[in-house]
A protein has these predicted regions:
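Active-site pocket-lining segments that scaffold enzyme catalytic pockets across diverse folds
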Residues: 1-21
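Dual-mode signal for accessory low-complexity, basic/Gly-rich regions
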Residues: 24-170
């Protein structure tokens, strides 16, 4: 579910006006629980890098801070086309700020919901943020897993989904 959000902040999407996050820098577009940082210099981490594919030096880059969009991934070409400052062309190592609960704690806190364990295809409209995904997992009732579910569709809008993020696991 994070992939369409990242795709929406690429310079090419912004330049082509094909993004549901167009003109949203420094605006609240997600829940306070959403803090996402690009950490390209994590020691011994897969994907760590000091330069992006264009040779631009990487640095720690806040992407979302408490639901506020802080940056786009602007490559050299897009920066020149839009007259914007380049950042880096693509994410390195994205880290989300941990919440306080483990998976069992998250499940126990839900009266009625669904634990999604897999996706069975689907799509997201990059301009509007509307999505539809096939999901499978387990029904949660009164804080406990009650029965498996499959062949179910989850539909909605990315801005609404991320604005309603209630918890992040640890």
């Amino acid at each position: 579910l994070l992939s369409p959000v990242i795709g929406a902040i690429y310079g090419s999407s912004i330049q082509q006006k094909n993004s549901f996050l167009l003109d949203k820098i420094d605006q609240k577009v997600a829940s306070d629980k959403m803090t996402l940082i690009d950490e390209p210099h994590l020691v011994k981490a897969s994907g760590a890098r000091y330069f992006d594919s264009e040779g631009v030096a990487t640095k720690r880059l806040p992407v979302f801070e408490q639901g506020i969009l802080k940056t786009y991934y602007i490559d050299t070409y897009s920066a020149n086309k839009m007259g914007m400052e380049q950042t880096i062309g693509s994410p390195s190592i994205l880290t989300m700020r941990n919440g306080d609960k483990d998976l069992d704690g998250l499940i126990a806190s839900i009266d009625k919901g669904i634990l999604v364990t897999g996706f069975n295809g689907g799509n997201c409209n990059s301009t509007t943020g509307d999505f539809s995904y096939g999901v499978e997992g387990f029904l949660i009732e009164r804080g406990k897993l009650s029965q498996p579910i499959s062949e179910m569709n989850a539909t909605g809008n990315m801005l609404s989904l991320w604005s309603n993020l209630a918890e992040v696991g640890n």
